[in-house]
């Protein structure tokens, strides 16, 4: 039986990051977590490109453009959608998650889902670097691991 796993060796990995500006007080912390992790794992700063979009709904379009460019080994998508008093939250969360998944499947590169979908601002804050860790950092680590797993499977 063969078992395959990725590792956290960041040799020659190029990363695209798409960040939503809406709820920037949260998303900027997710971005900081992702960048800190990538630097800690020795991803070269020149191999990281960040694109800011107005909100979470716009993330899939830019992630798709990045994937089609073939410049990146992985794409990290960061946003924060916080439930309000209308059904808008449900539509945005559903479409963003479907869009990101579809891009990954179509492009066959890792597109990491770092879009927080929370009921409260407090829950978002917890996931952006306090009690529940930093989902941006987790996505960066997952991106490196997935790139290496794909490289292993393609070898």
Swiss-Prot record:
The active site is at residue 88. Pathway: Cofactor biosynthesis; riboflavin biosynthesis; riboflavin from 2-hydroxy-3-oxobutyl phosphate and 5-amino-6-(D-ribitylamino)uracil: step 1/2. InterPro entries: LS, LS/RS, LS/RS_sf. Keywords: Riboflavin biosynthesis, Transferase. (2S)-2-hydroxy-3-oxobutyl phosphate binds at residues 85-86, 127. One of its GO terms (cellular component) is cytosol. It catalyses: (2S)-2-hydroxy-3-oxobutyl phosphate + 5-amino-6-(D-ribitylamino)uracil = 6,7-dimethyl-8-(1-D-ribityl)lumazine + phosphate + 2 H2O + H(+). Its EC number is 2.5.1.78. It comes from the Bacteria. The keyword Isomerase does not apply. 5-amino-6-(D-ribitylamino)uracil binds at residues 22, 56-58, 80-82, 113. Catalyzes the formation of 6,7-dimethyl-8-ribityllumazine by condensation of 5-amino-6-(D-ribitylamino)uracil with 3,4-dihydroxy-2-butanone 4-phosphate. This is the penultimate step in the biosynthesis of riboflavin. Belongs to the DMRL synthase family. This is 6,7-dimethyl-8-ribityllumazine synthase. It comes from Streptococcus pneumoniae (strain ATCC BAA-255 / R6).
